[in-house]
Swiss-Prot record:
Transmembrane segments: none
Listed GO MF terms: DNA binding
Signal peptide location: none
The protein's name: Negative modulator of initiation of replication
Assembly notes: Homodimer. Polymerizes to form helical filaments.
A GO term from the CC aspect: cytoplasm
Length: 186
């Protein structure tokens, strides 16, 4: 609370506007000036400074997002270049390795992507096998290594590629990597 001095005439005017016993001078003035009942923080910011602050915040957030994507790309490329991946002949295992790499590199992004990527009549991802098995007869589900997710694996090689590229697009992976995966599962 701050103390201010007012002349007698103003004091009597404010006092005459009292509506309830115990109402403070601040409450009366707020009501008379049509201000909110609770004090609001007041900061004087010049418009161009506010715009600069907003721009710097946006650029910082974009830089962090870009750094996370770069880390994801590096981890994913490491898997693509690894001897284990290159020498693997079974597409199902390659499919699972790449999904695992995506999950390890960006768990939240992967979780968001799996929630979005679905087929017209089939769910491709779930957090347990039973959820996938309920989606239809003949569904083969496998656990994605090092993740809590399961994926349907009895799809054609081309469909596996579509699933992978859809997840990668949802995770905002660069188009050159998406194209590279598309070629692997063509």
């Amino acid at each position: 609370m701050k103390t201010i001095e007012v002349d007698d005439e103003l004091y009597h005017y404010i006092a005459s506007r009292t509506q309830a016993i115990g109402e403070s001078a601040s409450d009366i003035l707020r009501r008379l000036l049509r201000l909110p009942s609770s004090p609001q923080p007041f900061v004087l910011v010049q418009p161009n400074i506010a715009e600069e602050l907003n721009a710097s915040t946006k650029s910082t957030n974009q830089a962090k997002k870009q750094t996370n994507i770069e880390k994801t790309v590096q981890k994913f490329e490491r898997v693509l270049k690894s001897d284990t991946f290159v020498n693997e002949t079974k597409n199902v295992r390659r499919f699972l390795m790449l999904l695992s790499a995506l999950h390890i590199s960006d768990q939240q992004g992967f979780a968001n992507a799996t929630a979005v990527v679905t087929g017209t009549e089939r769910t491709y991802f779930a957090t347990n096998e039973d959820m996938l098995l309920r989606c239809g007869n003949g569904v083969k589900a496998k656990k994605i290594p090092d993740s809590p997710f399961w994926v349907v694996t009895n799809n054609s090689t081309a469909r596996k590629g579509l699933i992978l590229t859809a997840v990668m697009q949802s995770m905002q992976m660069p188009s050159h990597l998406i194209d590279r995966v598309r070629v692997l599962f063509a």
